């Protein structure tokens, strides 16, 4: 009898496949959407800039005028002791948080809410940004980094600017150990071994004198877990 596949082991759940979230600095999201932001603005000061393992961008600790502290995603060009404004009357400049309905068309934004007050869900990776395309009476249309157009409530908040950390991929990873530790921070199993390179006991495509699958690579959605590898329930394969 063969061994369990990686997908079967992952489903069981072990420390090898568990993301080390205990090393994270904390939740990174907007403060509560209260009356101070709905009617005016609140000012905060960046008191520290932190590295968060498993996150592709630096984060900042912000202290607001009311004494509240939060972790936020910062844009390119921000530094310690800089101030940010949060609210409907905030100025249009990098780092400030406003409802989408108050952001002019063509301005880059990030950390966008999908529901007013949810803290920010979209466009949070280092170097990413979306564009405000157009406004309507009860909706705002934004263009995501993928090119997809999304319609949102104009009271959903977003931050002006581009997420910091965009140049992280410009420096090449020249050693396998560097890549190993980078993947370890996100619980990604690396390196990824091809099925045809494994022994027959480890994978349905393994074994043999030459590296070939030896059986159909397109498999049913309802097949047994130990055979579910390759193109699962594929409508078509190959070039389009």
Curated annotation (Swiss-Prot):
**Coiled coil, from the record:** none
Q: Which molecular-function annotations from GO does this UniProt entry contain?
A: rRNA binding; structural constituent of ribosome
A biological-process GO annotation = cytoplasmic translation
Signal peptide location: none
Could you tell me the keywords of this UniProt record?
Answer: Ribonucleoprotein, Ribosomal protein, RNA-binding, rRNA-binding
Compositionally biased residues, Basic residues: 21-30, 224-240
**Where is region (Disordered) located?**
1-33, 204-240
> GO CC: one term?
cytosolic large ribosomal subunit
InterPro entries cross-referenced by the UniProt entry: NA-bd_OB-fold, Rib_uL2_dom2, Ribosomal_uL2, Ribosomal_uL2_arc_euk, Ribosomal_uL2_C, Ribosomal_uL2_CS, Ribosomal_uL2_dom3, Ribosomal_uL2_RNA-bd_dom
Q: Which Pfam families match?
A: Ribosomal_L2, Ribosomal_L2_C
Q: List, as start-end ranges, the regions of compositional bias called Polar residues.
A: 1-20
Task: Summarize subunit and interaction data from the UniProt record for this chain.
Answer: Part of the 50S ribosomal subunit. Forms a bridge to the 30S subunit in the 70S ribosome.
Family per UniProt? Belongs to the universal ribosomal protein uL2 family.
Its annotated function is as follows: One of the primary rRNA binding proteins. Required for association of the 30S and 50S subunits to form the 70S ribosome, for tRNA binding and peptide bond formation. It has been suggested to have peptidyltransferase activity; this is somewhat controversial. Makes several contacts with the 16S rRNA in the 70S ribosome.
- Report what the protein is called: Large ribosomal subunit protein uL2
